[in-house]
Curated annotation (Swiss-Prot):
Compositional bias per record (Basic and acidic residues), positions renumbered to this chain: 781-797
Entry protein name: Eisosome protein 1
Organism of this sequence: Saccharomyces cerevisiae (strain JAY291)
Keyword Ubl conjugation among UniProt keywords: no
Membrane topology designation: Peripheral membrane protein
Length: 843
């Protein structure tokens, strides 16, 4: 059994949908007709015919209509709500925006039964159309046009089929251009129609003012109902349904269109077309008049015929009297006034003043509304069965949707496959045809190209040969003339060349004699300048040579001192090894003495020896400890001395390297000065450029010579200062040695205290790190031997001699050597020497 009843083709547009025009009548009548057809058995749509060919589009469309594809609940609109899924929201919005009392008046359609009832109840009016023949003709034409253009959207105007049609006539007369004959006819027709009766029933009372006020009041009430005041609150989801309902308003223009049985846009279009046609006609007449005036005299030089001129003047005066503007305005005002009177006389025939018509329309609307409420939001399924959209969707999704989906999928797949096969075959055939045509065109083009190229080559060959021959002849003639000109020019140049050679030989002889004389004078002058420059060079380089000799001597002394220090280091290392060996022997003796003391203690306890024998044994132990402490002190002093000598050797190596670099620098300086002198002598200058010397050396040559003289004086005074320092050191050493001999001589000091002091000094020496002057501190403690004093004196003499040797040529104040080449290194070494001398004097 099919759940969707079959529908005839003529009733398809009336089921489940509203009409496309302004009237939205219900589809109950059409659905009742469809109920007569019984339910038919469901048949699957055949996509292909028995012969295997696919169905046409029309057959597929009818099959889908038959099986309800286009009338499915998901696609069709219900009677009550357009979208069944959003029925609750739309119902809430409609209830809020449009009240039920207003909804009846807001309907943009009227039931045909209501219009028929209103038309029957209204009185029929007999119109006297005796204005003019032209107006009656236009009224008939307008009636026929309106009947042909009448649409379902203008159903409300059927009730006024017998009303007057002067509104359209007034619009036509206003838009058209007036002429003399039309004005006269209008005046005559209007004078005759003033006495005619408009209505069959005579009016006893003048209710014009009452009717006008009632009409205004009714319009204001209807406007309040049509466009109620909106509140500030909302319910539910807002939609645009209310906007679609209020897209029309019953204004005066709309009412005039309803009375004319024409829709608003169509009436506007008609008016626009009439205006455009009138403008075109006026323009054409204007252009024709201008053309006639322009062509009336083809020969402007000839005189105009007097009879023609008089006729034209009479015609102009006559037309000016007949078609004056005042006459036309008066005629137009009279016509407009009469038309307004005619329109106002039919007030009882208007829509809102006809109470009987409104009552009949409301009664029909209420009856239709009661019929609709029974099956509200339900769909007629046939056989008196009405189902809601939800039930239909459930049934369709459970039974019909899968089958239809599978059928449609297979049909679409097969159709797509057939289309693809057809496209492929068509494309293949097309490409094959194109390829064949291309091959044929290539063969024909090749044959044509060969013939054309051969002919073209022959013609080009002939033309090129002719051109080459002509150009060759012209070139030969041109070259012959040039050769003749060049030969004459060559003879002239040869004669000029002989004269020029003679002149140049004489000039060369004179120039050679002059240059020989200048060369002799210049050679004598250069020899004199060279001798003077050499003398100046020797004077300038003398201090540099002296500095170089002093630096080389200083380098030799430093090398000798380094060798002596290395020999002293090797000797001290041997002594340290010897002392370590002795210390190990003393340690063994101490261990043996401890064992002996233990044995002696046992013997004293056993035998009870005397006090003297015990003291003698104790004194031996103390002596051994003192000797051990002494050896340790000697070892520490010699290690300190070794480190001091290593430091001195490193210092000497650095100084020797510094002196070597200074020597190289001085040599380079001398080479630079010699080069500068050579350059100056080559240029012929008497002196060296002092500015360049100042940039390189830091001072001029004269300042450098005076400074080197002061340095030499300070170097001469340096040995006397060193001798005084050495004498003071020797006196201090003698005092230290005398004090040590007194302490070692035993001036009432016990041996045990000396041993303790020796151990304390040795431990202090071992804990402290050796510095550069640790030997002097150990000497001042008064706990060292005479040999150590001698070695210290020897080392001090070596250091003093080293410093004296290093500073033989540079032992001056740092201010005097501030601007020399090696001023930084020399000044730093001099400051170190002065610090060492001051420390020794303080001690």
């Amino acid at each position: 059994m099919s759940l969707i009843s079959a529908v005839e083709d003529r009733d398809i547009h009336n089921i489940g949908k509203t009409s496309g025009g302004g009237s939205r009548t219900s589809s109950i009548n059409s659905s009742k007709k469809s109920l007569k057809h019984g339910s038919k058995s469901l048949r699957k749509p055949k996509v292909y015919q028995t012969t295997g060919e696919p169905l046409s589009r029309e057959a597929l469309y009818k099959a889908k209509l038959k099986y309800g594809v286009y009338q499915s609940p998901a696609q069709s609109y219900s009677i009550g709500v357009s979208d069944a899924h959003a029925a609750s929201d739309k119902a809430a919005n409609l209830a809020h925006d449009n009240q039920t009392t207003v909804e009846a008046y807001k309907r943009m359609f009227i039931d045909p039964n209501a219009t028929k009832a209103a038309s029957k109840m209204g009185p029929k009016v007999v119109r006297n159309n005796s204005i003019t023949s032209a107006t009656s003709k236009t009224s008939k034409e307008s009636q026929t046009k309106r009947k042909s253009k009448e649409s379902p959207g203008a159903a409300a105007s059927k009730a006024y089929s017998m009303t007057m049609e002067t509104t359209s006539l007034s619009s036509q007369t206003n838009s058209r251009s007036y002429s003399i004959t039309s004005a006269s006819s209008v005046l005559s027709g209007a004078s005759g129609s003033f006495n005619s009766t408009v209505n069959p029933k005579p009016k006893t009372l003048n209710l014009e003012k009452v009717l006008v006020g009632a009409e205004k009041k009714a319009e204001s009430r209807i406007k309040e109902r049509w466009e109620p005041e909106k509140t500030n609150f909302q319910y539910g989801v807002k939609t645009d349904e209310h906007g679609n309902l209020n897209q029309f308003s019953f204004s005066n223009e709309m009412m005039n269109n309803i009375m004319a049985k024409v829709d608003a846009p169509k009436a506007q279009d008609l008016q626009k077309v009439k205006k455009v046609s009138a403008e075109k006609e006026a323009k054409s007449m204007k252009f024709a008049l201008g053309a006639a005036n322009a062509v009336k005299d083809m020969h402007p030089g000839e005189d105009i015929d007097k009879s023609i001129a008089l006729k034209a003047q009479k015609r102009e005066t006559y037309l000016s009297q007949l078609t004056s503007q005042q006459v036309l305005t008066l005629a137009r005002a009279n016509v407009d006034r009469q038309l307004d009177i005619i329109e106002k006389s039919d007030m009882h025939r208007k829509l809102f003043t006809n109470m009987e018509y409104n009552k009949a329309a409301v009664a029909v609307a209420q009856s239709n509304h009661q019929k609709k409420t029974e099956f509200h939001n339900k769909i007629n399924m046939g056989g008196g069965l009405f189902l809601s959209p939800e039930d239909i969707t459930k049934i369709a999704s459970g039974l019909i949707s899968p089958v239809l989906g599978e059928v449609s999928e297979r049909a679409e797949a097969q159709r797509a496959m057939d289309e693809e096969i057809a496209e492929r075959t068509e494309a293949y055939n097309k490409s094959l045809n194109e390829w064949e045509t291309m091959e044929r065109s290539i063969i024909s083009n090749d044959a044509k190209v060969l013939t054309t190229t051969a002919n073209r080559h022959q013609t080009e060959k002939k033309t090129s040969q002719e051109k080459i021959k002509a150009s060759f002849d012209a070139l030969v003639a041109r070259m012959d003339t040039k050769v003749a000109e060049r030969e004459t020019l060559l003879e002239d140049t040869k004669s000029k060349e002989i004269e020029f050679k003679k002149q140049m030989q004489q000039e060369l002889k004179d120039e050679k004699a002059r240059l020989d004389q200048d060369l002799e004078e210049w050679g004598k002058k250069c020899e004199q300048d060279i001798t003077e420059a050499r003398k100046e060079q020797e004077e300038l380089l003398k201090p540099y040579h002296d500095d170089l000799a002093n630096a080389e001597a200083e380098h030799k002394t430093l090398v000798e001192e380094r060798d002596e220090i290395n020999a002293e280091i090797s000797r001290l290392q041997d002594a340290i090894v010897d002392h370590k060996r002795k210390i190990s022997g003393y340690g063994n003796d101490l261990d043996a003495q401890k064992n002996r003391n233990i044995r002696e203690d046992d013997k004293l306890l056993e035998l009870g020896q005397t006090k003297e024998s015990l003291e003698s044994h104790l004194n031996d132990d103390v002596i051994i400890l003192a000797n051990k402490a002494k050896e340790q002190a000697e070892l520490s002093t010699k290690e300190a001395r070794l480190k001091q000598l290593e430091v001195d050797s490193l210092i000497n190596e650095r100084k020797s390297e510094l002196n070597a670099t200074e020597i190289e620098l001085k040599k380079e300086k001398l080479n630079l000065l010699e080069a500068m002198k050579d350059v100056a002598s080559a240029r012929g200058d008497d002196k060296i450029d002092e500015e360049k010397v100042k940039k390189l050396i830091g001072m001029t040559s004269e300042e450098y010579l005076t400074q080197n003289k002061s340095v030499e004086k300070n170097v001469e005074d340096l040995p006397t200062q060193l001798e005084k320092i050495e004498e003071g050191d020797e006196l201090k050493k003698e005092e230290i040695v005398g004090a040590e001999t007194k302490n070692s001589g035993g001036d009432g000091v016990p041996v045990s205290t000396a041993a303790k002091e020796a151990t304390e000094t040795s431990s202090a020496v071992q804990t402290k790190e050796p510095e550069e002057k640790i030997s002097i501190g150990n000497k001042s403690s008064g706990k060292e031997d005479a040999n150590d004093c001698k070695s210290a004196e020897h080392s001090k003499e070596i250091s003093v001699s080293q410093k004296a040797g290093n500073n033989k040529s540079l032992g001056v104040s740092p201010d005097s050597l501030e601007h020399t080449f090696s001023g930084f290194s020399q000044g730093s070494s001099i400051e170190d020497d002065q610090d060492a001398i001051s420390n020794q004097e303080k001690k």
